[in-house]
Amino acid sequence: MSLYRSPSAALLKSPSQAAFGAPFGSMSVADLGSLTRLEDKIRLLQEDLESERELRNRVERERADLSVQVIALTDRLEDAEGTTDSQIESNRKREGELSKLRKLLEESQLESEDAMNVLRKKHQDSCLDYQDQIEQLQKKNAKIDRERQRVQHEVIELTATIDQLQKDKHTAEKAAERFEAQANELANKVEDLNKHVNDLAQQRQRLQAENNDLLKEVHDQKVQLDNLQHVKYTLAQQLEEARRRLEDAERERSQLQSQLHQVQLELDSVRTALDEESIARSDAEHKLNLANTEITQWKSKFDAEVALHHEEVEDLRKKMLQKQAEYEEQIEIMLQKISQLEKAKSRLQSEVEVLIVDLEKAQNTIALLERAREQLERQVGELKVRIDEITVELEAAQRELRAVNAELQKMKHLYEKAVEQKEALARENKKLHDELHEAKEALADANRKLHELDLENARLAGEIRELQTALKEADAQRRDAENRAQRALAELQALRIEMERRLQEKEEEMEALRKNLQFEIDRLIAALADAEARMKSEISRLKKKYQAEIAELEMTVDNLNRANIEAQKTIKKQSEQLKILQASLEDTQRQLQQVLDQYALAQRKVAALSAELEECKTALDNAIRARKQAEVDLEEANGRISDLISINNNLTSIKNKLETELSTAQADLDEVTKELHAADERANRALADAARAVEQLHEEQEHSMKIDALRKSLEEQVKQLQVQIQEAEAAALLGGKRVIAKLETRIRDLETALDEETRRHKETQNALRKKDRRIKEVQQLVDEEHKNFVMAQDTADRLTEKLNIQKRQLAESESVTMQNLQRVRRYQHELEDAEGRADQAESSLHLIRAKHRSSVVTGKSSSKIFVTEDDY
């Protein structure tokens, strides 16, 4: 029983301890070597178990042979009883010879008692040897129990440390949940910003269409300007012809001078009326200037007010024409001869005054344009400085992004190594589970066989009791036969010879059986000594290994506590930084709202940015699709990782690595959030710069529109001058050289002003083109900042997903550790139950041996008694 108990107890302890100790190993090659050594030890224990099973089977076969021999002896005893019954009558005749046989019987009894004493001493010596061996095995079992209690104490301490780690993990999970909530809020804000960007893109498309229409109108105005230049050339030729005609008309004018003096008084009255009309015209022109200033502020009223003002000018012109016609009719009545000349003169004077007023307006507008150009140049310089700052920030962000990418590559490489180590540990763990299952099955078979042996021993004990009762009955019959022995001397003589022969055979069989038993006992003692030596070496090696593992676990627990304290400090710092970043984000949102309001005022002049925003939108869609694909890939990878971690998450070293990775991931998340906020601020600044550039462009375009309107008015005035020149040519014969010289100088001044205005218009157009190119460059920078923002957002999303994965891994590792603890407790209960069953089996075996010794003693005594009777 002790031979069976020790290896089974060792087998129960070693796999359970291996199953408990294996999760606390590290993922190095040394731990894999220790796992292989454990497998070798388990194989050796299994081989020892097989050898002990073979020995047990051999003992069972010998016990079966002995039971067969006992049955044969009982059969012979029954035959002997039958022969005694048949010879009772003959023994009655030989009662006289009984006295002689009694003496011989007493002598034979003394001899049998001496032989029984010798056999009893030998049996007691063998029993003492067995008891010594059993005591030694019990001492070894006590040592093993003490080792088991020590390991249980260590298990309790490890459970306490695991509970502390679970509490720390719970606090870390709460902090991670807060970070997730903050990340979700930031994601919602980013979505709102994306919606605003989409709305701005739609508005920019509309402005692009309006800008295209304006460009078409500018092209038409350029064509009209070319036509006007051609007309100016033709007018110059006509002016030369008019000069020649004026020389001819000068001679006629001297003749008409006297007549003109008479009409001069009437012309003075007409001039007073014309002065009043010019004052009214100047008032109207002043109103027109006020209307132009209001047009710049109120764009929606521009067209209506221009139309209204144009109608007022037309009405005034019509009134002037009517008055002029009335005056001409009066002059024709007064002086029919000079009516045409005076009409032309009055008309030319009124138009010259109008041109003077228009020229002053043009000079004022030119001065305004010059001031606006200087302001635009200053703003362009500021934009250049800001763009340089944006480029510097962009380069810094790109460097930070490259550093983050390098860190991500390192983390990916470490993650792949961890996955490979997890797979190897999963395979090793599966092998250990299979071997543990086989050992449990072998233990169940051994328990079943032990139960069968107990039943067999009980049956043999019953048979031995029956044999003892039969022997008692035979003794009573022997006493009856002693009274009748005198009548059976002849039969007893023959029976004595037969019994001596049988007794000799029995003695030979008992001697052979004793030798076989002694040989088996010696062999079992040697096997027990070998098993004991192996068990001691195995226990010492396991003790050293567990002590080393406990030291490693203490070191890992200390490192884990330090890492947890550092992680809590970093979490506090990051929470403060997140609060600061949230405040800055709110400020940036308010600034963005202001920028959007300003951008709404400049909706019509952002057409050049529509194509770039569309490209940004497509890039954003592509980034979103890539992000979704990455999330799908990440979910698949998470599935594979969860499958691997569900097997080996009971390893404390992996848990330590996961917690360190959690801290590094939180640090990376904080860095990425900082970069995200910095990129958001840079994008907001770039958008503000773009909005200011768009406003400047809008002002330049308004100035260009004013210049175009002025150019149109000048063209109309030139046309009117052409008509007036044609009329003057008709009336040149009646005019004077002074008026013609004034008109020529006025025309030259107007031409130079027109050339200067066209040159400035071209310069403003070139400046507008430069501004457009600069705005496009700024928009490209804004697009790059937006791309960086999208990339940073993707990295933030990936880090949040990784944080969730690590949280799940921590939860799974805790569940696996709890399962392992429950499994260790279950193994302990099973070990205690097995030890109790082994003790019960040992006690029952002692009882069976005692009963067997008593049955052997009674059997030998009965056989000696029959021998003495046969002698008589």
UniProtKB/Swiss-Prot annotation:
| Coiled-coil residue windows | 32-851
The alphabetical list of record keywords is: Coiled coil, Cytoplasm, Disulfide bond, Motor protein, Muscle protein, Myosin, Phosphoprotein, Thick filament
Q: Where is this region: Nonhelical region?
A: 1-31, 856-866
Gene Ontology biological-process entries: actomyosin structure organization; cortical actin cytoskeleton organization; embryonic morphogenesis; locomotion; mitotic cytokinesis; positive regulation of ovulation; positive regulation of sarcomere organization; regulation of actin cytoskeleton organization
**InterPro entries registered for this protein in UniProt:** Myosin_tail, XRCC4-like_C
Give the free-text PTM comment from the record. Answer: Phosphorylated on serine residues in the N-terminal non-helical region.
Query: How does inactivating the gene affect the organism?
Result: Defective extension of body wall muscle connections or arms towards the ventral nerve cord. Double knockout with madd-3 results in severe muscle arm extension defects. RNAi-mediated knockdown causes an accumulation in the proximal gonad of endomitotic mature oocytes in 22 percent of animals.
Molecular function (GO) terms for this protein are: cytoskeletal protein binding; protein kinase binding; Rho-dependent protein serine/threonine kinase activity; SH3 domain binding
Instruction: State the oligomer form and interacting partners.
Output: Homodimer. May interact with unc-89 (via SH3 domain).
- Free-text comment about domains: For most of its length, paramyosin appears to form an alpha-helical coiled coil and shows the heptad repeat of hydrophobic amino acid residues and the 28-residue repeat of charged amino acids characteristic of myosin heavy chains. However, paramyosin differs from myosin in having non-helical extensions at both termini and an additional 'skip' residue that interrupts the 28-residue repeat. The distribution of charged residues is also different from myosin heavy chains.
| Task of the protein | Structural component of the muscle thick filaments which is involved in assembly and organization of sarcomere myofilaments. Involved in ovulation. Plays a role in the formation of muscle connections, also called muscle arm extensions, between the body wall and the motor axons in the dorsal and ventral cord.
**The protein's name:** Paramyosin
